[in-house]
From Swiss-Prot:
CC annotations in GO: chromosome, centromeric region; condensed chromosome, centromeric region; kinetochore; nucleolus; nucleoplasm; nucleus
Keyword Secreted: no
Native source species: Schizosaccharomyces pombe (strain 972 / ATCC 24843) (Fission yeast)
Assembly mode: Component of the inner kinetochore constitutive centromere-associated network (CCAN) (also known as central kinetochore Sim4 complex in fission yeast), which is composed of at least cnl2, cnp3, cnp20, fta1, fta2, fta3, fta4, fta6, fta7, mal2, mhf1, mhf2, mis6, mis15, mis17, sim4 and wip1.
Official protein name in the record: Inner kinetochore subunit cnp3
Residue spans of biased composition, Polar residues class: 235-261, 295-304, 313-322
Annotated Basic and acidic residues bias: 166-185
Positions of region (Disordered): 55-209, 224-386
Keyword annotations of the record: DNA-binding, Nucleus
Annotated GO MF terms: centromeric DNA binding; kinetochore adaptor activity
Length: 643
């Protein structure tokens, strides 16, 4: 079923499909009236439209529904509800009467707001309608019969049915007829809730006295009713408290005139303010920790001295007249710089300076007199200000001396430093050790170990001290040149005897003619030796000496990263001397490394290999020899030429 079929109003097309006239909103609970009255200015009463109490009595009791329906937890409407325009007034009247008579129905906040608005406009109707207490008693008796407690179970009451309400009552009210739109200036001003109490406070016109008195009477009669459980049910809640507004009195302003006693007190305050020293200076002086009793005595003595030195001057009439009626005491500000001096003091100081002036002085007497007077005034002021400071400093010095004495005693006792005997490190591998013994003391009950002896071992060999080198005087440049010339001459002489090859005549080994001789090369300079490349290898060699078939010698050069492959020594004995570089040698199954000036051999019948592991070329001087007699016996051929 649609909404238009159930309603008495014929269906018509509207731009706004959410509301129809005379229909209660499904969520908001507002009832849209047929016509809205306008004021003299042509404005609609929007306050009454939005403060409509359509949801006031939606939870009222309905006797017929309660009798027919079984007890359920919640009721849901099966179809939307509609109301005719003719039945608006009756339904609204019945709902308002039943809501006033039934105390169990909670008052809607919209109703309370609308009633408060009427009261603020000055309507004659009461804010809250008085209720008969007999109705509460009768209803309590009826509800007591309905709700019964069986053990811990409680029967559930059926939910109250909803009822549709219109606003005919509000239309007929006097406020509605005399409606005029209010301006923002006519609205009640916002006043804070916490206002101070004062005799000049008056009640705000927004809440007239008549409405407030009626509200107080109703609240006094209708306080609270206790239910079956013994708890208080509050049926009325104050929505807004009466506000107070401050209104200016038309009475003449009352000025407080100071009395004679008040004047005297103010004069004393000004005097005390003028004679007080600077509080910041006192605080800075009192920052040292000093007993309060000593400070109070010192300050009292200093104040008496200051009174004798600088007596208080009488007040002038201008200072008394400056304190006006109703004004606070003027704050005396201290000017910067030194205070001005009186003319009498300057004159006296000038006379004394002229009397004591020495002849021949360059500066005039007046300047000297001014300086003397300034020094006197400064000394008087400094004495009064620093009297308390000097006393405090003396106390602080005494305290510091006591603290230093305590610290010295602590160091003697051994609080800051331990009494442990300090021992240099011991060479335990030389059997150096510490010998302890038990020390018994009358004051100490247990015996404590103490160091008896430290055993140290001296070196058997005496230390040889190196003597200081004698410092020779610097030689002159002539002597240095002569030494260089001598060295150059020696080199030239050596070069004259230096040769690439050395040939000489030697005896030849011959059994038949032992005196036979021959000429042979017996020496070479290595730079003059010409090296030859070995085929299929990176090695270079030069055969220098040969004695067939038993002996041979020469030089081998290996570049960086080169390697001589593994070869057998056979029946020869080989020896090598490293002239330059670093090599890695393998003899049989052993590998080792050698560098310059190293020598090694390869015995008969072993395999060997050589590898250059350095970054530069390696030079080796090699020799190999064989036993000819043994070779003949075994039937071995001539001397091999392998290198």
């Amino acid at each position: 079923m649609t909404m238009n079929e159930t309603s008495a109003i014929p269906a018509r097309q509207r731009e706004n499909q959410f509301f129809e006239i005379g229909v209660v909103g499904r969520k908001t609970g507002f009832t849209v009236p047929r016509d809205v009255k306008k004021g003299d200015d042509g404005f609609e009463d929007m306050d009454a439209y939005f403060l409509s109490d359509g949801s006031i009595h939606l939870d009222e009791d309905n006797g017929d529904i309660e009798q027919d329906m079984p007890p359920v937890t919640r009721l849901q409407p099966t179809s939307p509800m509609a109301v005719n325009a003719a039945s608006d007034e009756a339904s609204h009247a019945s709902s308002s009467d039943s809501s006033d008579k039934n105390p169990d129905i909670p008052s809607s906040p919209l109703l309370m707001n609308s009633r408060a608005l009427r009261a603020s406009r000055g309507s004659s109707g009461p804010l809250i309608v008085p209720i008969d207490h007999s109705a509460f008693q009768a209803e309590d008796e009826g509800t007591a019969d309905k709700t019964k407690v069986d053990g811990n179970k409680l029967s559930i009451q059926p939910r109250k049915a909803n009822r549709i309400v219109d606003f005919s009552r509000i239309k007929a009210s006097p406020d509605r007829k005399k409606f005029e739109p209010r301006r923002s200036t006519e609205l009640p001003s916002k006043i804070p809730s916490s206002t101070p109490k004062d005799d000049n406070v008056q009640e705000s016109p927004a809440f007239p006295d008549e409405n407030i008195t009626a509200l107080q009477k109703n609240v006094a009669n209708f306080t609270s009713i206790k239910d079956s459980g013994g708890r208080d049910n509050l049926y009325i809640q104050t929505i807004s408290k009466p506000r107070r507004s401050y209104v200016q009195n038309n009475k003449s302003e009352q000025t407080i005139k100071p009395s004679k006693q008040n004047k005297q007190k103010e004069e004393k305050k000004t005097i005390s303010q003028g004679n007080k020293p600077n509080s910041r200076d006192e605080d800075s002086e009192l920052s040292i920790d000093v007993p309060l009793s000593m400070l109070n005595r010192s300050l009292a003595n200093n104040s008496q001295k200051n009174k004798k030195r600088t007596p208080n001057k009488p007040l002038q009439e201008s200072s008394i007249n400056s304190v006006k009626e109703g004004e606070s005491n003027p704050v005396v500000k201290r000017k910067r710089g030194r205070p001005r001096k009186n003319k009498l003091e300057i004159g006296n100081s000038v006379q004394t300076s002229e009397a004591t002036q020495v002849k021949g002085a360059k500066k005039p007497a007046i300047r000297n007199a001014k300086k003397m007077s300034n020094e006197k005034d400064d000394s008087l002021n400094s004495q009064s200000d620093s009297a308390s400071g000097e006393f405090i400093k003396t106390i602080a010095r005494n305290n510091l001396q006591e603290i230093k004495q305590v610290e010295r005693e602590d160091t003697l006792v051994g609080v800051r430093r331990s009494k442990r005997t300090r021992i240099a490190p011991l060479a335990f591998w030389k059997n150096e050790r510490v010998v302890y013994e038990l020390h018994r003391d009358e004051n100490r009950i247990p015996a404590l170990p103490e160091v008896k002896q430290i055993i140290r071992v001296d070196d058997p060999s005496p230390s040889i001290r190196q003597g200081r080198k004698k410092r020779h005087a610097k030689r002159s440049g002539v002597e240095i040149k002569s030494n260089l010339e001598a060295k150059s001459n020696d080199v030239e002489e050596y070069d004259a005897f230096y040769k690439d090859e050395i040939n000489c005549e030697v005896l030849s080994w011959n059994e038949q003619n032992p005196k036979a001789s021959e000429e042979r090369v017996v020496g070479y300079s290595l730079p003059s030796v010409n090296l030859q490349q070995i085929s299929n290898q990176q090695l270079k060699f030069a055969s220098l000496f040969k004695e067939e078939p038993s002996f041979a010698a020469g030089v081998v050069e290996m570049p960086a990263g080169a390697e001589k492959p593994v070869k057998p020594s056979k029946h020869n004995i080989m020896s090598f001397c490293i002239l330059q570089g670093k090599i890695e040698v393998t003899v049989n199954a052993t590998t080792f490394r050698m560098k310059k000036d190293g020598v090694f051999i390869v015995p008969r019948g072993n395999y060997y290999s050589i590898k250059n592991i350095g970054k530069e070329a390696v030079r080796l001087y090699y020799t190999h020899a064989t036993d000819t007699l043994e070779n003949k016996r075994r039937g071995i051929g001539d001397f091999p030429n392998e290198r």
